[in-house]
Amino acid sequence: MRYLSVMPISSSDAMPLPASTPAGSTSTSTNSTFTRALLYTAAKLYYDEEATQAEVAKALGTSRATVSRMLSEARRQGIVRIQVVPPQEEAHGSLAERLRVKLGLHRVYLSGPLPTPAQQKGTVDVMGSVLAPATAEALAGAGLMPGDVLLVSSGRTVYEVAQYDLTPIPGVLVAPTVGGNDQPEEWYQTNEITRLISNKIGGRPNYLFAPALPGPDLYPTLTKDPAIQRVLGLWPQARAILMGIGAPPLLRADIPQFVPITSSSLREAVGDICSRFYDRDGNTVDFPGSERLIALELSALQDIPVGIAVAVGAEKVAPIIAGARSRYFNQLVTDPTTAQQILAVE
């Protein structure tokens, strides 16, 4: 089985041909003859839109021979990527497609397998390295351009993924979706995760210097602060979001200290995104003080064009299903075992 993809280009590559080197030029210097924008256009027409070389030539005002050279050059520069997939990975793709259909998502990206309980290393020890390639692929497919806004949530999974290489997306504005936490664990610090993600993709970090749950007296002042308003103002502009999904609060070994786990309302919660809890139907589950929470609303997630959730584990099955059906995200990065567990749910 063979898969082919045409990779998007950055805006810096999107420039017209110089007047001295028209599309039909026979110059042997492909770097001066064919811009990456032109190569991308030719490849997009031929591979994605299934136009013939003659049709591409007509659309670009050039010859078939030139189109053939363009397609070869597009492959050489990595604009067109062809992957030969062995039968095992083909089955992997079938699992991803079945999960995508079940959850009604746009895309599902499956990672390699995570360790079983019988193996020496725990899931958390290798989670980042296993999930990072699939997450990088999802981010690369988000179509982000310089100046676009990418939001990131807190959480152990996103934090672990942020330790590894991701696809460069230079010029993207990266911003947190929830205020800070006074707990020492790094995965509760969204500014730290924002910094890590920005460094990995070559983005521009925007930090939110506010607690996730300020007191009643501090909340009105904070939300009027210009520096905080600037970051909150990025939320409605988001083109994409990378988010973790929390397990049911009553089953978690650790949870933000501001969450009152003794609150009766949280008994209905199956999970959370950006510290916003929800039940099996995706309805918001409030708790005492949650009206002061400085965090992205669940309803706002539905308006973000590309919502990438990264989650693994049996305890994440229910929140993944509820979150997907509520359209809180439209893409999922997970492992094969979690995918099979979700498919087993009636």
Ranges and model annotations:
Residues L173-N181:
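Catalytic or ion-translocation cores adjacent to nucleophile or general acid/base/metal-coordination motifs
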Residues P8-I9, P16-P18, T28-A43, D48-V56, ...:
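Conserved phosphate- and dinucleotide-binding cores of soluble alpha/beta proteins
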Residues M145-V149, I169-G171, A238, I304, ...:
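A general structural motif
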Residues G112, L151-T157, V312:
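Glycine-rich beta-strand-to-loop/alpha-helix junction loops that act as flexible
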Residues A42, L131, T135-L139, V161, ...:
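Generic hydrophobic alpha-helical segments
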Residues T157-P168, A253-I261:
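Short Gly/Thr/Asp-enriched flexible loops that form oxyanion-binding sites at enzyme active sites
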Residues Y3, T30-T33, R69-L151, Q163-P170, ...:
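HTH-adjacent hinge/linker in prokaryotic transcriptional regulators
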